[in-house]
Amino acid sequence: MKIVIADDHAVVRTGFSMILNFQDDMEVVDTAADGVEAYQKVMQHQPDVLIMDLSMPPGESGLIATSKIVESFPDTKILILTMYDDEEYLFHVLRNGAKGYILKNAPDEQLISAVRTVYRGDTYIDPKMTTSLVNEFVNNTGQDANSTNDPFRILSKRELEILPLIAKGYGNKEIAEKLFVSVKTVEAHKTHIMQKLNLKSKPELVEYALKKKLLDF
């Protein structure tokens, strides 16, 4: 199987490439350092599996890239690699189309197993996360009480890209340059974000981003 690894740390890309290339049925054909590059590498190689870090440079996080890649290249299975053992992250990536979720501190054998699992089309969840997943379903009554305040359901993909950048202090021009859009487009999205989330000021937006853990994306 062909594999692409996307992580902003070179040591992670190199280390995981060595582990996977040692397997007879696996070949790491390329690596990427951010979400934009990950999309380009998937388009170039059409890999069977993309292993992608959830938190990469702002503007194109693993979560945003996952949604775009799933939409454009549905045959590529995405395994999210992360240090966050938080069910919120888990549910967000699964909703966006990822097939697996594994922690960075997982043993080598577990990584190999995870890759093979998603390659087969099955879903892989790090064993440390299964308890959280079960508890969530047990407590779920069929109606998500927080859905009206869930940014991943309220905001568009572009708005989810822009919100963390605003909260981190980037100006409209800087955001426009990062996302290759006009300043007017950024301003319009900012207005829509504030309206959709019922926020009145930038401090409220920053507080919201922190509470929803959006600054990690």
From Swiss-Prot:
GO terms for molecular function: DNA binding. Keywords: Activator, Cytoplasm, DNA-binding, Phosphoprotein, Transcription, Transcription regulation, Two-component regulatory system. This is Oxygen regulatory protein NreC. Transmembrane segments: none annotated. SMART domains: HTH_LUXR (SM00421), REC (SM00448). The keyword Manganese does not apply. It comes from the Bacteria. The lineage of its organism: Bacteria, Bacillati, Bacillota, Bacilli, Bacillales. One of its GO terms (biological process) is regulation of DNA-templated transcription. Residues 2-119 form the Response regulatory domain. The modification 4-aspartylphosphate is found at residue 53. Member of the two-component regulatory system NreB/NreC involved in the control of dissimilatory nitrate/nitrite reduction in response to oxygen. Phosphorylated NreC binds to a GC-rich palindromic sequence at the promoters of the nitrate (narGHJI) and nitrite (nir) reductase operons, as well as the putative nitrate transporter gene narT, and activates their expression. Phosphorylated by NreB. One of its GO terms (cellular component) is cytoplasm. It is found in: Cytoplasm.
